[in-house]
Amino acid sequence: MSAVDPIADMFSAIKNAIMRRDAFLYVPSSKMKERILEVLKREGFIQDWEALKGEKYEEEFKKMKELAEKSPNPKMRRYLQQLIDYNKGTQYPLKIYLKYLDPKKRRSALTNIVRVSKGGRRVYAGVRTMPYVKRGLGIAIVSTDAGVMTDHEARKLRKGGEVIAFVW
């Protein structure tokens, strides 16, 4: 993954994991990613997420190493490699548990996630110009001076800010 737009990389990793019908995935950490994941969890698009620091990382690494050695499934080796790659310097892996509405068909709660504000073109919206996503059925994730929140919460607090993504 490139370091040009880490948030877009996280969104791509989530979409790819949903297409593979994975139960969870790992992404490198950042404060902004943690805030975005908290909004996605609160709105019901993902089941949960956790930061794997210190002992949690060691436990997860042991578990994945054992599974990768026992299983011929290449998916386990990929997870193990991600754990190793994302635990460098001050970064640590974030484990995202995906949410599926129908366990048999594995239909995801998250249909699509689109990055709006990018490095080359920042998109800002005031209270009156805050976009509605899918006529109110989706959410816009907005970064305001009061923190990262949905478009509904931003309208309620009368705050504008940078539109990070559309989710439905």
From Swiss-Prot:
Keywords: Ribonucleoprotein, Ribosomal protein, RNA-binding, rRNA-binding. One of the primary rRNA binding proteins, it binds directly to 16S rRNA central domain where it helps coordinate assembly of the platform of the 30S subunit. One of its GO terms (biological process) is translation. The gene is rpsH. Coiled coil: none annotated. One of its GO terms (cellular component) is ribosome. One of its GO terms (molecular function) is rRNA binding. Residues 59-93 are annotated as: Not found in other S8 sequences. Belongs to the universal ribosomal protein uS8 family. The keyword Ribosomal protein applies. Part of the 30S ribosomal subunit. Contacts proteins S5 and S12. Pfam families: Ribosomal_S8. This is Small ribosomal subunit protein uS8. The keyword RNA-binding applies.
